[in-house]
Amino acid sequence: MNLDNLNSLIELFFYQSDKQNKKSIFLQWLNPNKQITYTWGETQKSILKLSKTIKKNIKEGDRCLLVSENRPEWFISDLAIMLSGGITVPAYTTYTEEDYKYLIEDCEPSLVIVSNNEMLRKLSNTINQKNFIKKVITLDEVNKVLDNQDSVNKEKYLDFNTLLKIDLLEEDKFQNNKLKRTSPACIIYTSGTGGNPKGVVLSHGGILNNLVGACEIMKPLFNSRPVFLTWLPLSHSYEHCVQFAQIAVGAKVFYAEKIEKLLENISEAKPTIMTAVPRFYQNLYNKININLKKQTGFKAKLIDATLRLGKKKLLNQKMSFSEKLLNLIVNQLVRKKIKKQFGGNLKAFVSGGGALDKEIGEFMNSIGLPTLQGYGLTETSPVVSCNPIHKIKVETVGPPFKGNQVKIAEDGEILVKGENVMLGYWNKKEETQKVIIDGWLHTGDIGEIDSEDGYLKITDRKKDIIISAGGDNISPAKIENMITNEPEIDQCMVYGDKKNYLVALIVPSKDFLKEKEKINNVIEKINKKLTLLEKIKRIQLIKENFSIENGLMTPTMKVKRKKVTEKYKDQLENLY
């Protein structure tokens, strides 16, 4: 299959599903209350049946809002919308009623697909007010909410499972040849770390272009049918693209029940490959590290050898005969056991959605969990570059994908050009023109390109850089990573724009909530590794975690600096 020759993501799906065994399981939800599985054949039929209804209720180019947790029906809905000539607008389930109102008023969907009662409650008021919404398809029974609707509004609602019971006629089995590589596939709203989200319009060709690079990365990782465990929100561009990579490689896909059950789900699914964001690896690093540090005697020596030799191998440093022998021993006694905790079949983690700390990257790779750091943003469909398994450089985000042009502007900003670049921001022509100049997308990230092998390195986010009172540029991300790598500290945010020194908001780990002296000692230890300008002079401990629920983190677990600063402005200013 040559991805460059395909016109649409729909063409990709039908090409792959026609090749697969129709009875082979393709999609499976690991929810004990809803044991849902779809074979390749059932998935194809379900997409065609759902599309039959959608086509009657939308025109070509109409937007369709999709609000659901990760589950097989998410996949089916997304493909059915595109097959019908619609544009999928995925939305996070963590949004508030106001967030949904903003999205609906901005993209004006003709159709809404929503998962359950809980999510529909947040949408129903806006749905009832908007005449442009023709139909609402519910994945689960939602009688509780519908009981309060008048008869006119009740007619808007259709049940997903009922729609799948309709008969397919020969003319319903079509593949929509009108779609082109330049056709919009989806509008993904950037969660953003401040301000209203912007709708990023991505094309079929942009995502297909991304898949060429993704398949190159995955090719050396497996020689049989790969298994994926999907747990990051499918409404995020990162996991949304992974969904199409799963089609391209003919994978078996498991959907995690929920984040709290992730480790159990990993044991059950035994994934070959997993995608995650830096916060996941940081939590993993702290948990594994705490357990490793408890070991004494011979076990402690084995762990030390695992980390030391793993790092040597990662850096392609020469090993003596005795080191090679010891490395084989720790492979069996240490790395194999760690790998078993992740199902035993894991070939690689792929990290994206933010910068992965170098120390964590080295640690993960050294203990036998290969971790490939990539880089991208919603506006680039989303991947720009990724480390290949045969040559990992943890301090970088790897070489650019085929078809992506990358250059560094005079001020250090990373610029990207290629088919993967978005078509633009929905309804925001001026905003689009500000970031795409002469075909080059201005990413807002600061970086450099390694002259030796063309690997890209991200040094900071342009808008996050702190400029001190003396005009010096300081990277908060570097300092924050060093602080949160310590087991005593769960989260932090560094502050100090236009100030004489830096301060930090610290959320201690639960075992250290009342241990201010120990936290101070940790900061003192870190300060010894920092330059005079980077040192943290004062700290403020807070008990409440930054979370998606309290609006202080994005759905991919990045701290919303603007919101945190607004909430804790007085405490921060009192540190000066």
Predicted feature residues:
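AMP-binding/adenylate-forming catalytic core of the ANL superfamily
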Residues: 112, 408, 418, 423-424, ...
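Conserved AMP-binding/adenylate-forming
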Residues: 274, 314, 330-456, 462-465, ...
